[in-house]
A protein has these predicted regions:
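N-terminal pre-domains immediately preceding structured catalytic cores
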Residues: 5, 10-221
């Protein structure tokens, strides 16, 4: 179903010359039975995501290989790179500037409905439990994509959320949050070992800017 949706959107791009075309929402055919049950009983209201942050296929102006992930923290977007200078763009929640992480990592682990064990730093700043089981109430949401460097967990993740109303804002403790529907979609696409590039704030290297982003990240060349 997801492949068919992408094919239709790409056809629309070619016929209409469009740069930006909205994708259809995630089909439940991509959800497990557990996904359907937990999302149907989620303890939060369904958010009205602004059009600018809804999933779309867009032109892509960097040189990362298809299958890579690039996060533009300034614009609050995550890109999953496709062939032919295209990418799937998702609206995300990013970390507050003092807490945000940037750099190059790899996907070192993937989990469905992950549990959450807050880091010592988070526990110093926030009144949170020591451990939260996976589920719709969990801040990690429906999926966790764990970022590793040199085979070591960075403690930063791309994951779902139980606060979808904050998509497009910078309020997290450093991790990249997505709607649960979008993180399920990304999780099903991204492979273990895939490159993840999180751009530094104000780097001027946005994937949507063809004037400054054509070279990609030099550390990947």
């Amino acid at each position: 179903m997801a492949g068919r949706g992408i094919a239709l959107v790409l056809a629309g791009l070619l016929l209409g010359g469009c740069v930006h075309t909205q994708l259809e929402p995630s089909s439940e055919s991509n959800f497990t039975q557990r996904d359907k049950k937990l999302l149907a009983n989620a303890p939060y209201a369904k958010a009205n995501i602004p059009t600018a942050y809804q999933r779309a296929i867009v032109q892509y102006h960097r040189k990362e290989a298809p299958g890579s992930i690039v996060v533009d923290t300034d614009a609050r977007y995550l890109y999953y790179v496709l062939p032919d200078n295209r990418a799937i763009r998702y609206g995300v929640i990013v970390g507050e500037e003092a807490l945000s992480w940037y750099g190059i990592a790899k996907v070192g682990r993937k989990e469905e409905w992950p549990s959450w064990t807050p880091t010592a730093d988070i526990k110093r700043r926030l009144d949170v439990p020591n451990f939260v089981e996976g589920g719709a109430h969990n801040p990690m949401g429906a999926r966790g994509i764990y970022l590793y460097q040199a085979n070591k967990d960075t403690l930063f993740r791309i994951h779902g959320t139980n606060q979808p109303e904050y998509i497009g804002q910078a309020i997290s403790s450093g991790c990249i949050r997505m709607t649960n529907e979008d993180v399920i979609d990304l999780f099903n696409r991204v492979k273990m070992g895939s490159i993840v590039v999180v751009l530094a704030p104000r780097s001027g290297d946005s994937p949507s800017n063809p004037q400054v982003a054509t070279a990609g990240d030099p550390r990947l060349n």
